[in-house]
């Protein structure tokens, strides 16, 4: 298949070997670049754009970069050249007028304030970027920052010498990572148990240790006020070196309904992949193996989940409730933004609790202040859903209809003991999640 290279917002400049795209007549293709791009997933080798992204809103830019990631082949690059907000502000502070303004006949500029407002608002500018902001929105939608480049320079010959605007002070090359596992890969998976209640801990631990995928780290971060968890664990540590135990400081134990314990599990995990396991839940023996196999099926998978079977205190099956019913009749790849919008519109977490999901640790490393946050706000009550939404913005999900986890309902669950408080926190969290995704243009 011939390589496809796109030149977005080409204006009157056409590149040989590229599909030159603009809204104006004369381009190879006339397209509205704020709408979905008409290329199949993983079909494009590279994308170039100079002095276009600042002419659309932040939300439209996020969607455009999401589309670029979708259509790029793994390893493909999108190169964005745009004015540098940091330089614009420095010019204002230093009372410097760039020669480019004079070249275009703007010798009448009177003062730095006038020049700054021109940079922000003239020529249809809607949103200017510095390196931090442009890098952030690229990572948000699943692209990796490959390099910040100087004008005309690139490690890829096809992008060299392309810039023609002296004010292209910010040039970033993003790369689409290769997320697909090879069939014979055996990555290290951390099964992370944020332990607190010892009642069902032994059963949870045994379900982790009995996994058919054996390249495991079983990490226990212990929030239990006493020594019950450690005592149970000592029996297993003697015979299984995959177990790693961390006792949380007494001053943080149980804090924020266990949220801090989840985040310690995340930080301490050594595996490429993380599989949370609540101390009262269970995993099917083939859970990790089946979920890893799903990562071999497509390029853009960031999250694998499955149906979870509700059980009672004795391990007996309970009937499904709305959120635990399988949303599909057979195993399915579900596009991330579509799934996220469905969840936020319906108000139902069909992906599941932390026990339900397998994901790469690195995918959430850029979320601040931590992966259970959204829009900079640490969340409780829907903290797991915050993680899933970040992952869905970066790629697609796979839902497996086989029940690979067992979600235990009992009277001592946090949701039961602190029901009213958890409900209020969840309601606040849903509002934060919905507002963020709407503001970023990730849902209508």
Question: Where in this protein do the model-derived segments appear?
Answer:
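Conserved SAM-binding loop
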Residues: 3-90, 172-177
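Conserved nucleotide-sugar donor-binding catalytic segment
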Residues: 191, 324-420
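Short aromatic/hydrophobic "clamp" motif used to bind/position activated sugar donors
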Residues: 274
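Acidic donor-binding segment of Leloir-type glycosyltransferases
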Residues: 206-252
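S-adenosyl-L-methionine-dependent methyltransferase catalytic module, highlighting the catalytic core
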Residues: 60-63, 67, 73, 77-179
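N-proximal low-complexity "stem/linker" segments adjacent to membrane-targeting elements
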Residues: 179-209
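Glycine-rich, basic loop-to-helix element that forms the pyrophosphate-binding segment
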Residues: 204, 249-269
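Conserved donor NDP-sugar-binding/catalytic core segment of glycosyltransferases
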Residues: 286-325
């Amino acid at each position: 298949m011939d390589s496809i290279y796109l030149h977005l917002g080409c204006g009157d400049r056409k590149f040989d070997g590229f599909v030159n795209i603009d809204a104006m007549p004369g381009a190879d293709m006339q397209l509205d670049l704020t709408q979905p791009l008409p290329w199949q997933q993983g079909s494009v080798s590279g994308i170039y754009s100079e002095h276009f992204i600042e002419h659309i809103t932040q939300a439209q830019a996020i969607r455009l970069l999401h589309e670029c990631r979708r259509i790029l082949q793994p390893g493909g690059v999108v190169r964005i050249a745009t004015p540098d907000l940091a330089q614009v502000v420095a010019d204002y502070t230093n009372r410097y007028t760039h020669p480019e303004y004079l070249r275009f006949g703007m010798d009448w500029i009177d003062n730095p304030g006038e020049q700054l407002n021109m940079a922000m608002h003239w020529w249809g500018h809607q949103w200017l970027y510095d390196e931090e902001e442009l890098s952030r929105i690229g990572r948000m939608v699943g692209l990796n920052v490959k390099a910040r480049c100087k004008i005309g320079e690139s490690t890829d010959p096809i992008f060299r010498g392309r810039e023609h605007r002296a004010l292209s002070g910010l040039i970033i090359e993003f790369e689409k990572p290769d997320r697909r596992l090879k069939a014979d890969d055996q990555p290290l998976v951390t099964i992370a148990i944020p332990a607190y209640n010892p009642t069902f801990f032994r059963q949870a631990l045994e379900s982790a240790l009995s996994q058919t995928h054996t390249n495991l780290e079983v990490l226990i971060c212990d929030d239990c006020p006493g020594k019950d968890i450690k005592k149970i664990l000592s029996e297993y540590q003697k015979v299984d070196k995959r177990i790693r135990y961390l006792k949380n400081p007494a001053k943080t134990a149980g804090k924020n309904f266990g949220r801090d314990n989840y985040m310690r599990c995340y930080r301490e995990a050594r595996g490429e992949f993380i599989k949370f396991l609540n101390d009262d839940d269970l995993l099917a023996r083939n859970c990790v193996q089946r979920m890893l196999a799903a990562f071999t099926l497509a390029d853009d998978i960031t999250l694998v989940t499955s149906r979870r079977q509700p059980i009672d205190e004795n391990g007996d099956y309970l009937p499904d409730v709305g959120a635990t019913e399988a949303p599909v009749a057979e195993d399915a790849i579900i596009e991330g933004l579509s799934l996220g919008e469905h969840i936020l519109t319906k108000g139902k977490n069909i992906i599941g609790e932390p026990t339900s999901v397998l994901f790469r640790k690195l995918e959430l490393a850029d979320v601040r202040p931590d992966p259970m946050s959204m829009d900079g706000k640490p969340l409780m009550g829907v903290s797991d859903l915050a993680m899933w939404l970040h992952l869905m913005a970066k790629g697609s999900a796979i839902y497996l209809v086989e029940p690979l986890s067992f979600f235990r309902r009992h009277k001592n669950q946090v949701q039961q003991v602190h029901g009213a408080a958890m409900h209020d926190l969840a309601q606040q969290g849903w509002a934060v999640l919905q507002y963020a995704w709407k503001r970023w243009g990730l849902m209508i």
